[in-house]
Amino acid sequence: MAQFSAHRQEWFGSVTNSNIFEVIMMADKDGNIINAFGLSSNINIAAGLVDGWATIHKFGAVPAMSQNSSGTIWDVNDTLYPWDAFDTPSALTISTTTSNGTLSSLDDGITVHVLGLDENFEEVEDTFTISGNSATGTVVFKRVYRAYIDGTTANQTQIRVSNDTDEILRINIGKSQTLMSIYTVPAGKTGYLLQGVSTCAANADATVDMYVRYFGQDSFRIGHTAEVAGVGGQYSYQFGVPIQIPEKSDLDIRAEVRSNNARVTAAFDIVLVDNEI
């Protein structure tokens, strides 16, 4: 393309050291030039127009934590997420119960989708149809990160998904989807954590920690921490340089609360990039 120097008031027609410069552009998979800066550049990634790039938005809420308790921000109060349940990959089972754990058939016939990773840490999905108060799957999972229901009405029961004897997913009554601030980066991809947010119910406060277990390590360690209070509004942090999270690494957002019946939420956004790029 023709280039013009506003400073020298001449076209860059001759090839000299002062006239040579480099123009770098970013294109989608169809060759269309796209914006490489700012929030608008992420729209093409979310739309699937950039090969090898994808996004995941994870969000969770713990309903009502007890005073001076701690746990993962997911659908079960005062409980750390049972990562050890995945030491042996297995198929899953579902039971539908009342809020106190009594089996119930109110959601007979509904469809439940479970998303996660298989024994090779690759994306898989299983679909369950509740018969009475239970269902059994066929897909083997090494990790799970989301479940949701089909239908025109919300679930009337707690939908509890188990791996052997451990509950690893729960859809609380009326929510139609899990609310869990955990995630595992799939095989063949690297995650780039862009931002995180957290809130507390009014008159509640908590310490919220992002724990990361990097693949190949046995324990989680803190990757970010925040103090969150209901009277202070939401905590929001956008990383100036995204945090790199290697494939097969686990994220677990946890809260330690100081008030009773504290509802705490957390969410984060990750861009996933194929390792071969």
Model-predicted regions and their roles:
Residues 1-39:
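Short, low-complexity N-terminal tether/leader segments at secretion or assembly junctions of large
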Residues 2-9, 36-142, 151-277:
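Beta-strand-centric surfaces of beta-sandwich/beta-rich domains
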Residues 147:
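A surface/extracellular/periplasmic glyco- and lipid-processing/surface-interacting theme
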